[in-house]
From Swiss-Prot:
Pfam (any one): UPF0102
Native organism taxonomy: Bacteria, Bacillati, Actinomycetota, Actinomycetes, Micrococcales
Protein name per Swiss-Prot or TrEMBL: UPF0102 protein TW312
Domain of life: Bacteria
Annotated GO MF terms: nucleic acid binding
Family per similarity comment: Belongs to the UPF0102 family.
InterPro entries: Restrct_endonuc-II-like, tRNA_endonuc-like_dom_sf, UPF0102_YraN-like
Length: 120
């Protein structure tokens, strides 16, 4: 991984790695980069009947650090966006188990992926 990769490209690569990781671990990716006027969800996936909004955080170093950038305000927004996604897809939030996870992807010294299940 070169050091001149743009922040956008790094984020896109991190999301690709996160999707692959989730798929290998039994998740079905339902949507990526879902956007509405209020914001964006990186990944929406399903496993064992649970709909999961996954926030992907990428960085060059230390897989624990990027996760620290998810604030209480961001968690509230992710919850709102997940409910908006459910509404758009005609799914009833009261009949489905929901969860918010985070996946941290770092590249230096080597690729490291950490999945934080149920951050909210």
């Amino acid at each position: 991984m070169t050091h001149d990769v743009s922040k956008y490209a790094l984020g896109r690569i991190a999301e690709d790695k996160a999707c692959n990781y989730l798929s290998v671990n039994g998740y079905i990716v339902l949507d990526r980069n879902w956007y509405c006027r209020f914001g964006e969800l990186d990944i929406i996936a399903r496993k064992n009947g649970v709909i999961v909004a996954v926030e992907v955080k990428g960085g060059k170093r230390n897989a624990d650090y990027p996760i620290c950038n998810i604030t209480v305000k961001k968690l509230s927004k992710l919850t709102f966006l997940l409910k908006a996604w459910l509404h758009e897809n005609k799914l009833n939030e009261f009949c489905i188990d929901l969860r918010i996870d985070a996946v941290s992807v770092t590249f230096i010294p080597e690729l490291q992926i950490r999945h934080f299940v149920g951050i909210l």
